[in-house]
Amino acid sequence: MQSNQENSKKGQYNLNKLQKRLRRNVGEAIADFNMIEEGDRIMVCLSGGKDSYTMLEILRNLQQSAPISFSLVAVNLDQKQPGFPAHILPEYLEQQGVEYKIVDEDTYSIVKEKIPEGKTTCSLCSRLRRGILYRTASELGCTKIALGHHRDDILQTLFLNMFYGGKMKGMPPKLMSDDGQHIVIRPLAYCREKDIERFAIARQYPIIPCNLCGSQPNLQRQVIGDMLRDWDKRYPGRIETMFTAMQNVVPSHLADADLFDFKQIRHGSEVIDGGDLAFDRETLPLQPSAWQPEEDEATPARLDVVQIR
């Protein structure tokens, strides 16, 4: 009995620490990129996955203590995928007392009609979904659209573009939408996926599976994700350091002539960003600069995904 109580106290203690870290990460991202301003109405895109549930809860939590006033409205797009449990999100949101809107649009049929059997449908589905969400944001009078992408998503996108697209391009924490009418924010930009997963497990969110459409998985993204997870296990701190590198770009030491004017470097030019250090072996720390020891964790749990029958 006493052992169960101790485990319960330890579990609650770890959950509180985890929530504080997620709050801090989200708060720092909001401040660094000026994501939320006085009077904003934020459309929180809710898919039923661990990331969007966590984003909604942390934003609601911050809303109570923020020095500015802003409102939230959760939006889910029901794309009429076979077996989609349409009751899950309304029941959860009503229980939580969250303002919400469910948008019903049968994009599934459109995608199935346009994309040959066996081919990935993600690209077309994403474009259709994006347009509907932009329209919905306008209808609801929202000034910002919040998406649940986290730090691992951003790094995966960076490596996908480097390996397959020949670009140094990631996923920005804040951007202007394709139509130039909406500001899109990613409040979880500083959050680790493993923290989000642990938080979602502890909160017992009613997770909706993401493969209801039957689409083929994005194998390239899957390979990159596996690579990053392997690095995270074998080289603790590497992921943190790579993300820090994305925030410390030195254009003069890359090779993009559009980003830096190399042609103007001549005899007598000033030394820029330390000059040429190519022949000097820089002293690097034994541990990655952003490395932090892991906190004590109980036996790894698993997300309780809603069973679709």
Curated annotation (Swiss-Prot):
Intracellular or extracellular location(s): Cytoplasm
Domain of life according to the entry: Bacteria
Residue span of motif PP-loop motif: 47-52
Manner of cofactor binding, per the entry note: Binds 1 [4Fe-4S] cluster per subunit. The cluster is chelated by three Cys residues, the fourth Fe has a free coordination site that may bind a sulfur atom transferred from the persulfide of IscS.
Enzyme class: transferase
InterPro entries assigned to the protein according to its UniProt record, in alphabetical order: Rossmann-like_a/b/a_fold, TilS/TtcA_N, tRNA_Cyd_32_2_STrfase, tRNA_thiolation_TtcA_Ctu1
Entry cofactors: Mg(2+); [4Fe-4S] cluster
Record keywords: 4Fe-4S, ATP-binding, Cytoplasm, Iron, Iron-sulfur, Magnesium, Metal-binding, Nucleotide-binding, RNA-binding, Transferase, tRNA processing, tRNA-binding
Record carries keyword Metal-binding: yes
Further facts: The thiolation reaction likely consists of two steps: a first activation step by ATP to form an adenylated intermediate of the target base of tRNA, and a second nucleophilic substitution step of the sulfur (S) atom supplied by the hydrosulfide attached to the Fe-S cluster.
Protein name: tRNA-cytidine(32) 2-sulfurtransferase
Protein's organism: Erwinia tasmaniensis (strain DSM 17950 / CFBP 7177 / CIP 109463 / NCPPB 4357 / Et1/99)
Origin organism lineage: Bacteria, Pseudomonadati, Pseudomonadota, Gammaproteobacteria, Enterobacterales
